[in-house]
C-alpha cells in the first residue's frame, strides 16, 4: 500500500476518527518511505486529545484495520515512543489523517 492509497482510504473517515479522539495519525516505516511490499505491515503513529487505556488503543487499531482493509497495522501512541527510536520515527512520519 502506498501513502497516497492510505490517505485516500482514511480521508472519508476523518470525522469519525476525530470523534474517537484522534488528533493526528501519521504513517512511518516502509509505507512512509515508499518501499513497502505485500508482506509489509502499516506502522501508524497516533495522538489523542485525551488519555486513553490499552483496550481503547486496541479498539482504534481494530477500527483502522477495518477502514484500511488490512490486518497488519502496528499502532503506537506518539507519547509512548521509545527515546532511542523517537527521532528516527518522527523524522520519517507523514501525516495521513
What positions do the PLM features span?
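Catalytic core of pol beta-like nucleotidyltransferases
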Residues: 1-24, 32-38, 50-97
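Structural signature of the urease/amidohydrolase superfamily beta/alpha-barrel
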Residues: 41-43
Amino acid at each position: 500500500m502506498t501513502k497516497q492509497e492510505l490517505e485516500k482510504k482514511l480521508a472519508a473517515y476523518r470525522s469519525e476518527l476525530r470523534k474517537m479522539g484522534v488528533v493526528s495519525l501519521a504513517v512511518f516505516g516502509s509505507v512512509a518511505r515508499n518501499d513497502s511490499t505485500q508482506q509489509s505491515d502499516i506502522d501508524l503513529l497516533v495522538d489523542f486529545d485525551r488519555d486513553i487505556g490499552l483496550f481503547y488503543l486496541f479498539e482504534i487499531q481494530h477500527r483502522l484495520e477495518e477502514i484500511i482493509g488490512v490486518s497488519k497495522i502496528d499502532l503506537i501512541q506518539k507519547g509512548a515512543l521509545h527515546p532511542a527510536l523517537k527521532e528516527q520515527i518522527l523524522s520519517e512520519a507523514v501525516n495521513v489523517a
